[in-house]
Amino acid sequence: MDQDNNNHNDSNRLHPPDIHPNLGPQLWLNSSGDFDDNNNNNNNNNNNNSTRPQMPSRTRETATSERNASEVRDATLNNIFRFDSIQRETLLPTNNGQPLNQNFSLTFQPQQQTNALNGIDINTVNTNLMNGVNVQIDQLNRLLPNLPEEERKQIHEFKLIVGKKIQEFLVVIEKRRKKILNEIELDNLKLKELRIDNSPQAISYLHKLQRMRLRALETENMEIRNLRLKILTIIEEYKKSLYAYCHSKLRGQQVENPTDNFIIWINSIDTTESSDLKEGLQDLSRYSRQFINNVLSNPSNQNICTSVTRRSPVFALNMLPSEILHLILDKLNQKYDIVKFLTVSKLWAEIIVKILYYRPHINKKSQLDLFLRTMKLTSEETVFNYRLMIKRLNFSFVGDYMHDTELNYFVGCKNLERLTLVFCKHITSVPISAVLRGCKFLQSVDITGIRDVSDDVFDTLATYCPRVQGFYVPQARNVTFDSLRNFIVHSPMLKRIKITANNNMNDELVELLANKCPLLVEVDITLSPNVTDSSLLKLLTRLVQLREFRITHNTNITDNLFQELSKVVDDMPSLRLIDLSGCENITDKTIESIVNLAPKLRNVFLGKCSRITDASLFQLSKLGKNLQTVHFGHCFNITDNGVRALFHSCTRIQYVDFACCTNLTNRTLYELADLPKLKRIGLVKCTQMTDEGLLNMVSLRGRNDTLERVHLSYCSNLTIYPIYELLMSCPRLSHLSLTAVPSFLRPDITMYCRPAPSDFSENQRQIFCVFSGKGVHKLRHYLVNLTSPAFGPHVDVNDVLTKYIRSKNLIFNGETLEDALRRIITDLNQDSAAIIAATGLNQINGLNNDFLFQNINFERIDEVFSWYLNTFDGIRMSSEEVNSLLLQVNKTFCEDPFSDVDDDQDYVVAPGVNREINSEMCHIVRKFHELNDHIDDFEVNVASLVRVQFQFTGFLLHEMTQTYMQMIELNRQICLVQKTVQESGNIDYQKGLLIWRLLFIDKFIMVVQKYKLSTVVLRLYLKDNITLLTRQRELLIAHQRSAWNNNNDNDANRNANNIVNIVSDAGANDTSNNETNNGNDDNETENPNFWRQFGNRMQISPDQMRNLQMGLRNQNMVRNNNNNTIDESMPDTAIDSQMDEASGTPDEDML
């Protein structure tokens, strides 16, 4: 019965075919349907009586004979295709000749059951069907004796095609039947092999198997029955059409034989697909009736078949429910595409308008103006009430253009679910309250950036918005305690809350929040100084689903909070983010408790927690791959060791910020190379970062890096070349902060940076240097042209310095590099004082002038370490004794004293000496490696410097002087230890010190050579730049002086001779002079008056002189690529700039 019902339902869902006479019904015969035989026969008889035309009356006998023949024909046709004789009982599987019932026998007879399924002979069915078709067609030929022979051949062809199609249907049924039989047979064999006839499980399986067989037979029976009905319908419709055709022929009308159309219809049937039956049969009957009616009503001799109209197709989408249609239209990517469909129908218009106004797309002022033009109208003036369709409003991108007036137009949006007013600084609380009034479906409100937030917003939410789930209101200073309490009490569904900078937020409200809002997953109550550990303990205990927790700049928070929490709850599995920035009283104990409670923590913000040490980083390393963001700005006690442990364990970190962590060195940059998913680096004011560390990090991370934002402001030791390599390795880089990095404060580079925020002071504007967006791409392109080509940051530093010397043609033919260096050094030593003085280094603010360059004796740099010139006379050691003492030396410490060792522990570096002397030598080893690192950094910086001309060298000169003084101090300490050992007269002490000298003499000599070569290149670079800068200074003076002289000469000529008419406008003269100078620089020197002007002194302002000397930009000369002055009053850019800098460094506002 289930199969019958399914077939019946399927037949009712069939689609109408195409009934054009020349095309035929498409796929109307290819589905299974269940029809009642009696109803079908009655319908056919009714159709025959009502639509069949009467034969023209010739004689009563002829009419009677034809009527009798028709009755005989109908009876014969019904008998031929009647399968009622095939009884259901004869088709069911039997057991010993008896039909099976629900009480199956325990005797298992699989073969007998399978044979019962083969009771239907498909060949017999095919023969019966074809016999019926043949008889029916033969009767047609007898009843229509006047048909020409050609048309009789068409009838015969139609019969053959019908028979072929019947055979195809039966083959499909037979294949399906055999497939089912084979599957059942396999199951029978499996059961037979098991031999568990008495098993209840086997009996249960047999019951299921028999039901499957019965279902298969029912399905097969229904398929054959449906096929009979389909063939019957074809024959009936063909008969009616052929009768009508014959009557038309008798009347003398020219009509088309319908046999061809029926042949096309039969050939178009696909027996392998399932299509509509019921509607297809109805369309076929409609065609027959229309054909006959046209024959009776149109006696003229025209082609009747051409007047049969095609049934207008039904648009499929119109049959879908409105909800489904809404989902389909909403899937279009571009919303403006669906605007074209507004005129399809009223239903479509309503759905499309709802989609368009559900979340209006407002990203720029033009879109806002267009949207407001509609919202200014009342609901009576518009076709639809658009306010009721709006559910989400976001004005974050047009915040500067939103005021109270514009927001008031949205009052009445009763179905509003989300309202976002981020950075809408001109809006007050009154229109916000008006918009929210009556919004009972409201879920989220974000008014970040609203300066004036009062009680009415909180009261409105408490009264009209019981479903609110998210409320973000930073800087809620003016909200009273009562309003806060009222809002919390009436917001039981609250999940996300952000109320900051409110002194009324105290322990009572926090506890109320824990009791009334148990669904909270995000809590942000930063800058709430009256909240203490006790209330937060209750809050964290109740909120088991908490994911994000922020409580910053609160000195009341101590280690007791999370230590007590560990005693109350076992864990906080949902916690993903914690922000305790500015909570200065927490220590490493808090971090340990947090890690134990929240093992899946992803984001940790501990900026300005000054008591945090490396121990916290060791604890955070337990989070492993879960950790993604770490912020340790102003955590001064963090060192490279803690960073190394953190990065080695947490390799999926994406964002790091160590701003103002002054103890971090280049080793931290090396460790950053182990983070393959790193996107953001914050190292603002990490003054120990140098070119060497940055180049190594870029080299280790490789090309196509994932970095997107890099903050290196106040890293004053960086030069242009490592930044160039960083840009070339990071194609995704969109933000680069280099504020107060002297090498980048030059007009040709700062022209690509963003304008400084409007609230910055003049000094802050001078050092501001931030590149973002297109500025980063322009900077990369400019540095490509500015920097000497290199094959990545792996180029040997010594090779770079040597090539620079060769590029200046300072090595003569046949002269070795050593000889050339000695000659160059001799020449430079004579000019060093003048070169260094010309840099104007003493004018640099903040530079320590105690390290005077006059103290550097460049002529005797090779003798800076005089300790190894001192010899120990009379001390002799055999090779066995030397090897024995060498075995006692801790060579690991000598090679790297800063590896994972205790700095306070002393290792053997001078075997045989006492503990005090060995401790002194350990200290000297550490100092030597610090010196070596400084010289390596200095060497890399100089190598980077020579790649780009006119870089700021003041800090390199300072580094050079400082390194020289370190060398002097280290030499003094070594000489003092040697003197003490020699005066002691202890042979063992002297032998131990000789072993140390044996290990380190070559290292010290190598250090001196690196320093010497770097100082030579640096001085050559300064000399070359000073020469060019002097030339530029002369050209500037000449240009200004020439313009002044030209104006005087022009005035004199006009007054005296009035011969030449020269433009008197000063700006025009300047432009003319500029164009002339740009066209040919030599024209200026060819002017007789050019050299005369150098005889006069011309005043240059200090700013101009500083620009010429140091490459600093002039604030009045900042230009963009199109030589247009940058507008520094752009509010969006200024706000964005200030936000980026502030987000990168908590104290960036103290520029």
Curated annotation (Swiss-Prot):
Protein name from the UniProt record: SCF E3 ubiquitin ligase complex F-box protein GRR1
A UniProt-annotated Pfam family: F-box-like
Primary gene name: GRR1
Pathway: Protein modification; protein ubiquitination
Alphabetic keyword roster: Carbohydrate metabolism, Glucose metabolism, Leucine-rich repeat, Membrane, Phosphoprotein, Repeat, Ubl conjugation pathway
Residue windows of the LRR repeats: 399-423, 424-449, 450-475, 476-501, 502-527, 528-553, 554-582, 583-608, 609-634, 635-660, 661-685, 686-714, 715-740
Molecular-function annotations in GO: protein-macromolecule adaptor activity; ubiquitin-protein transferase activity
Family annotation (PROSITE patterns): FBOX
Induction: Expressed constitutively at low levels.
Keyword set includes Phosphoprotein: yes
Compositionally biased residues, Low complexity: 38-49, 1066-1080
Biased composition (Basic and acidic residues): 1-18, 58-72
Quaternary structure (record): Interacts with SKP1. Component of the probable SCF(GRR1) complex containing CDC53, SKP1, RBX1 and GRR1.
Described function: Substrate recognition component of a SCF (SKP1-CUL1-F-box protein) E3 ubiquitin-protein ligase complex which mediates the ubiquitination and subsequent proteasomal degradation of target proteins. Recognizes and directs ubiquitination of phosphorylated CLN1, CLN2 and GIC2. Probably constitutes the primary response element required for the generation or interpretation of the signal that induces glucose repression.
UniProt source species: Saccharomyces cerevisiae (strain ATCC 204508 / S288c) (Baker's yeast)
UniProt keyword annotation of ATP-binding present: no
Residues carrying Phosphoserine: 199, 300
Lineage: Eukaryota, Fungi, Dikarya, Ascomycota, Saccharomycotina
Domain F-box intervals: 314-361
A Gene Ontology BP annotation from the UniProt entry: glucose metabolic process
Chain segments carrying region Disordered: 1-72, 1066-1090, 1118-1151
A single cellular component GO annotation: cellular bud neck contractile ring
Location(s), subcellular: Membrane
